[in-house]
């Protein structure tokens, strides 16, 4: 450092005497500074072993040379403009490195994005340094933006630049010997709030498993246990959407328990406590019903059918076959609950001869066939249930006109031919909509007969 200080003062005096600043710098200062960095580059916070480095090159090749030496990568890519290409031979000479030049326009940010993506795909598993020291503002900004984005998918990427501790305003240069390569921390690791935005985005899209993973990772990186509560919330909705009611209930109960602790009374999720308690109560009701398989537990039937109809609505655009299955099953549960009010079960309805004959006639009317062509199954299907309940005076179903019922008959009878059941058919959106509409009407009737009130599986807002 003493030698460089002395050189710097002699350089200053030579410039004051009227010498050319650039030529004098190259003659007096640069060889000593370059020799120092070739031997031991100054890197903050500490030297790291990069396998690949990518540099933007403008009209300051000295800074780029220091960045190449500081990164120490075996493979060096240089993004240059047509104007800065003239510095490539000098960079090779100063660094002793083989360079892989890539020409781009000085304002072509999209080209930088494409090149960084290409290079990271080519070197996916190794540490990569992205150096934005030199080049135009557009080039540096583009490389920084690319680095921030791709660090989400390539965590070994680091953004670096050559900084200095002392700038000489008279000579309008960083004071030689004060330069250092600064390696910026990955913001996705250093700043949990960045990942909180990603987690929030995933949560809003219904990607609850991925959101939970982000929240758990943030706990590990920051030590802030508040994110663990968000992870529990996302995990509850993930399990709920997967129809794993036991796991959803477990996560929901644990979440409410933690929100009750003094340390979390001011947690943003406590502002949604009433809605959360109602959702956990719904999960408890469904869990009891699934374990007991007793249609007298109407709150559980309601919760399960409500969930299935919600999933049908979510899936109708992207997965019509799944939407149909959800809607079919929701309607079946609601019809079975109404049948249970009569003391009957679909799998063993115990029809009297008179009831069987009346049901044949009702089905024949709906299907437009002769009664003798109707075969009654041992277990009542969807259309059989609907027709039988109407015969027994079910008020909600009795309000449906014969035309409406005939419109539904084909869709109800076609359940077993659906692609994910026993057949090859994909139910039409119109058929699914009709089934869901009928189920929704029965759900509202059941809702009025439960103590739960209107509830929604919709995720509560995160509060940030």
UniProtKB/Swiss-Prot annotation:
Q: Which GO terms describe its biological process?
A: defense response to virus
Which portions of the sequence form the region HEPN domain?
191-464
Q: Does the keyword Nuclease apply?
A: yes
Q: What class of enzyme is it?
A: hydrolase
The outcome of changing residue 416 to A is: No ssRNase activity
What does the cofactor section's free text say about binding?
Answer: Does not require a metal cofactor.
One GO MF term on file is: endonuclease activity
Using the UniProt annotation, give all residue ranges assigned to the region (CARF domain). Answer: 1-190
Q: Which UniProt keywords apply?
A: Antiviral defense, Endonuclease, Hydrolase, Nuclease, Plasmid
Respond yes or no to whether keyword Iron-sulfur is given for this record: no
Give one Pfam hit by family name. Cas_Cas02710
Upon changing residue 415 to A, the result is: No ssRNase activity
- Lineage: superkingdom: Bacteria
Regulation (activators, inhibitors):
Non-specific ssRNase activity is allosterically activated about 1000-fold by cyclic tetraadenylate (cA4), which probably binds to its CARF domain.
Task: Name the family the entry cites.
Answer: Belongs to the CRISPR-associated Csm6 family.
Domains (record comment): The N-terminal CRISPR-associated Rossman fold (CARF) probably binds the cA4 effector. ssRNase activity resides in the C-terminal HEPN domain.
What else does the entry mention about this protein?
Probably encoded in a type III-A CRISPR locus.
Q: What does this protein do?
A: CRISPR (clustered regularly interspaced short palindromic repeat) is an adaptive immune system that provides protection against mobile genetic elements (viruses, transposable elements and conjugative plasmids). CRISPR clusters contain spacers, sequences complementary to antecedent mobile elements, and target invading nucleic acids. CRISPR clusters are transcribed and processed into CRISPR RNA (crRNA). A single-strand-specific endoribonuclease (ssRNase) producing free 5'-OH. Activity is approximately 1000-fold stimulated by cyclic oligoadenylate (cOA); only cyclic tetraadenylate (cA4) stimulates the ssRNase activity while linear oligoadenylates do not activate the RNase. Another study showed stimulation by linear tetraadenylate at very high concentrations, but did not examine stimulation by cA4.
Q: What name does UniProt use for this protein? A: CRISPR system endoribonuclease Csm6
Q: Which gene encodes it?
A: csm6
């Amino acid at each position: 450092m003493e030698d460089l200080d002395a050189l710097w003062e002699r350089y200053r005096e030579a410039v004051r005497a009227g010498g050319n600043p650039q030529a004098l710098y190259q003659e007096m200062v640069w060889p000593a500074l370059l020799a120092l960095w070739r031997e031991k580059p100054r890197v903050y916070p500490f030297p790291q072993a990069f396998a690949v480095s990518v540099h933007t090159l403008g009209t300051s090749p000295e800074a780029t040379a220091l960045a190449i030496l500081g990164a120490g990568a075996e493979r060096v890519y240089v993004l240059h403009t047509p104007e800065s290409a003239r510095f490539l031979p000098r960079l090779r000479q100063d660094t002793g490195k083989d360079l892989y030049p890539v020409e781009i326009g000085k304002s072509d940010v999209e080209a930088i994005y494409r090149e960084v993506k290409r290079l990271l795909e080519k070197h996916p598993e190794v540490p990569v340094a992205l150096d934005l020291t030199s080049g135009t503002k557009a080039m540096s900004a583009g490389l920084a933006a690319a680095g921030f984005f791709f660090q989400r998918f390539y965590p070994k990427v680091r953004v670096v630049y050559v900084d200095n501790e002392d700038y000489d305003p008279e000579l309008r240069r960083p004071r030689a010997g004060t330069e250092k390569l600064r390696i910026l921390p990955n913001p996705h690791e250093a700043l949990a709030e960045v990942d909180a935005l990603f987690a929030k985005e995933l949560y809003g899209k219904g990607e609850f498993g991925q959101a939970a993973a982000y929240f758990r990772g943030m706990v590990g990186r920051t030590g802030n246990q508040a994110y663990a509560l968000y992870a529990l919330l996302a995990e509850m909705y993930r399990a709920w959407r997967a129809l794993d009611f036991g796991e959803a209930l477990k996560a929901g109960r644990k979440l409410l328990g933690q929100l009750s602790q003094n340390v979390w009374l001011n947690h943003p999720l406590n502002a949604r406590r009433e809605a959360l308690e109602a959702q956990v109560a719904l999960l408890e009701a469904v869990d009891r019903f699934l374990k007991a398989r007793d249609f007298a537990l109407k709150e559980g039937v309601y919760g399960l059918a409500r969930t299935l109809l919600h999933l049908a609505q979510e899936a109708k655009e992207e997965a019509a076959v799944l939407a149909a299955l959800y809607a079919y099953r929701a309607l079946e549960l609601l019809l079975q609950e109404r049948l249970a009010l009569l003391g009957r079960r679909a799998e063993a309805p115990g029809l009297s001869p008179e009831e069987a004959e009346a049901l044949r006639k009702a089905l024949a009317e709906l299907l437009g066939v002769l009664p003798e062509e109707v075969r009654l199954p041992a277990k009542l299907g969807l259309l059989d249930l609907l027709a039988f309940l109407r015969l027994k005076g079910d008020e909600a179903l009795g309000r449906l006109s014969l035309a409406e019922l005939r419109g539904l008959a084909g869709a109800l009878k076609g359940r077993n031919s659906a692609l994910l059941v026993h057949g090859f058919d994909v139910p039409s959106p119109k058929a699914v909509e009709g089934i869901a509409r009928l189920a929704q009407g029965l759900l509202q009737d059941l809702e009025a007969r439960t103590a739960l009130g209107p509830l929604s599986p919709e995720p509560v807002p995160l509060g940030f």
